[in-house]
Amino acid sequence: VDPIAAQTLADRILDWREAGIGKRLNGAKAPEYRAAGYAYGPRNGAFETVEELKLVMGMTPQLFAALAPALTVYSQTPWVDPSVAPPEVLRALSGMDEGATAGLLQARAAGGSTPVVKLGHAFTITVQANGQGGLLVRRSAVVRLTGRQSAPIWVYRWD
């Protein structure tokens, strides 16, 4: 994506998430969506699913397919955990050049220490069962620990 298109899409993503009528320089709020023929406007709140990103004006199927594997809406934290973040996300972080990214990935692969960050409350749990004849069954769930005794876990997604 060229830098101008990237900045435009970034502004539109931020406008999608932020309440209020104020629009970023290259962003889009409800009037811009209507003018472009969309039957909806921005949420003006946090993304509820990664797939919702497809609704942002200017998001292409190809770009979404490239970005989606590195995104989550479940962490409920404003930061990235470098001990588990995909390489693409690490490269996008401020101050993470190729050398720093490669060093962190090597340390992770070797079981070395990585920066300690506070863990969020959302986790992906994946279970795989191998059966006879090469049968393979895999299921994943995204869950959140609530800290409440009456409902200790919320299931966000079950695949």
Task: Give the location of each predicted region.
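Compositionally biased linear targeting/interaction segments
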Residues: V1-D159
